[in-house]
From Swiss-Prot:
GTP hydrolase that promotes the GTP-dependent binding of aminoacyl-tRNA to the A-site of ribosomes during protein biosynthesis. Residues 81-84 are annotated as: G3. It comes from Gloeothece citriformis (strain PCC 7424). Pfam families: GTP_EFTU, GTP_EFTU_D2, GTP_EFTU_D3. Belongs to the TRAFAC class translation factor GTPase superfamily. Classic translation factor GTPase family. EF-Tu/EF-1A subfamily. This is Elongation factor Tu.
Length: 410
């Protein structure tokens, strides 16, 4: 029997379930796979399978994440669900599982809770651009007015964090009732059961409301330099993995970071495994031959990019998860003016943490291992940085924190 080929006929979108503990994220994930499996568009996954999420390592941090996949008429989805709250925080900050959109699950019986708020804030900070809401456990609320109040509360909370609270689709239903119906009759079709129809209605909203992301290959070219060689008679070659976009010989690029001034040059050749390549694409490991550039002028940690697409910066705000002692992090707290290294793309840059802020905007004096915190950083050298970019915080070569750039200051 030949292995099934992965058909790339539909656009691919990465999503995930977020929300407070016990509001039904994993049950909803199971319900979606079961409802779509009834139409032959997914493999049905039980709650227990999803809940027993395997451990993964991302930037040296262990995270439990379950991955499921399914299709609708329009798209192919990869969906992440995390068993524990700490896993969500780590997942969203490290970008271990990239999310193009999220399904925020809120229990209609309880309304928004502290982690509901925290996940909305995190989605905003780490750049999950669009959310759709599933108001779960509708079967446990008899009072229609109460449902409307909870919906209003969710919309206000979304608006508070600068999501378009008035426009976001909210679908009411019961993930558990849908799972029970599909467990009894796995072949339920659309129109056979109200609870299952509500799950399908949710997926219709996700299809319509969460835009298809721009593919890496269509974004402006960027490659972080890993190594630099000089080839006699040919010039200087910079090697690295193309992060996004594409590159051909003859195109103009900028070399950005570390030095005060950005340098413009022309790519005279693209090579892979010592062979000339017509075009380098996102994901390729290539060598770029650069016109009129001396080996001394460029180094690891700079990036080569489409002119004007990225600028060097020294000051930014980051949302950071600080590793616990058990995760290999620090054993002791740190304070203002702490000076670790910030590992960005391919290099470590020393920076000073000038202040710490809690979720409510109040100043924090001391940061403990295991905390999630917003920090303002000043680097000693300018580096090509953009919003949504991931970084690690290191001390003597070991990772003590993971972060994402939430705002550029200068």
């Amino acid at each position: 029997m030949a292995r099934a080929k992965f058909e790339r006929t539909k656009p691919h979108v990465n999503i995930g379930t977020i929300g407070h503990v016990d509001h039904g994220k994993t049950t909803l994930t199971a319900a979606i796979t079961m409802a779509l499996a009834a139409q032959g568009k997914a493999k049905a996954r039980k709650y227990a399978d999803i809940d027993a999420a395997p451990e993964e390592k991302a930037r040296g941090i262990t995270i439990n994440t379950a991955h499921v996949e399914y299709e609708t008429d329009d798209r192919h989805y990869a969906h992440v669900d995390c068993p524990g709250h700490a896993d969500y925080v780590k997942n969203m900050i490290t970008g271990a599982a990239q999310m193009d959109g999220g399904i925020l699950v809120v229990s209609a019986a309880d309304g928004p809770m502290p982690q509901t708020r925290e996940h909305i804030l995190l989605a905003k900070q780490v750049g999950v651009p669009n959310l759709v809401v599933f108001l779960n456990k509708e079967d446990m609320v008899d009072d229609e007015e109460l449902l409307e109040l909870v919906e209003l509360e969710v919309r206000e909370l979304l608006s508070e964090y600068e999501f378009p609270g008035d426009d976001i689709p909210i679908v009411k239903g019961s993930a558990l009732k849908a799972v029970e119906a599909l467990t009894d009759t796995p072949t339920i079709k659309k129109g056979d059961n109200d609870w299952v129809d509500k799950i399908l209605a949710l997926m219709d909203e996700v299809d319509a409301y969460i835009p298809t992301p721009e593919r890496d290959i269509d974004k402006p070219f960027l490659m972080a330099i890993e190594d630099v060689f000089s080839i006699s008679g040919r010039g200087t070659v910079a090697t690295g993995r193309i992060e996004r976009g594409k590159i051909k010989a003859g195109e103009t690029v900028e070399i950005v970071g570390i030095k005060e001034k950005t340098k413009s040059t022309t790519v005279t050749g693209v090579e892979m495994f010592q062979k000339t390549l017509e075009e380098g694409l996102a994901g390729d490991n290539v060598g770029l031959l650069l016109r009129g550039v001396q080996k001394e002028e460029i180094e690891r940690g700079m990036v080569i990019a489409k002119p004007g697409s990225i600028k060097p910066h020294t000051q930014f705000e980051g949302e950071v998860y600080v590793l616990t002692k058990e995760e290999g992090g620090r054993h002791t707290p740190f304070f203002k003016n702490y000076r670790p290294q910030f590992y960005v793309r391919t290099t470590d840059v020393t920076g000073t943490i000038v202040d710490y802020t809690a979720d409510d905007g109040s100043a924090v004096e001391m940061v403990m291992p295991g905390d999630r915190i917003k920090m303002t950083v000043e680097l000693i050298n300018p580096i090509a940085i953009e919003q949504g970019m991931r970084f690690a915080i290191r001390e003597g070569g070991r990772t003590i924190g993971a972060g994402v750039v939430s705002k550029i200051i200068q």
